[in-house]
């Protein structure tokens, strides 16, 4: 592990999403039970201004309904089933997920929140997100290391908005281009970490050292193969997002 003495922290990608429907309360509860160090979610804004944990622009793939998240109210989303295999599940709001994470008393767990762009609401997504973090008292941590929330986006402007409004909140600039992540973009927007895909990291392992030299951590997604878990550990990746948090934790040495 070239960048530090400890193994990567394990982040449950959309919860324990290999075993439970993604972005459901059941998926996140299982991830926490399996010992995930962090949980990840994507957020989108409903027509009536609520942040919900949904990856796609539409609800077609993950629910019993169809349509754009941005054109539906929270009440309309609530009547859809986001579960599977006879276990119904309601849409999860960011507020509900934050409450779950903060109330989990066995250990502190970080929440990695990805804002999706381009969207019709633009900067309102980040504004609403910051308001929600402020409501829970986690928008202004004492330091980045002690932050309970990390904000991520593929959109550099979204990262910049967060850094400008809440400079102590850690941020991750996501991407699949080594040139983009290894260039000046992260510096320009003030990202505290870069987030390459595992494929990008396989092809360009030097990204980790390059980020570290600039004082940035590395967040790698989505790491499910045991060989890739070992690669991330060997390179010194800080955080790995996985659909299998329990299995991935078992592959790594204990902290």
Predicted region positions:
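Phosphate-group recognition and catalysis centered on beta-loop-alpha active-site segments
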Residues: 1-255
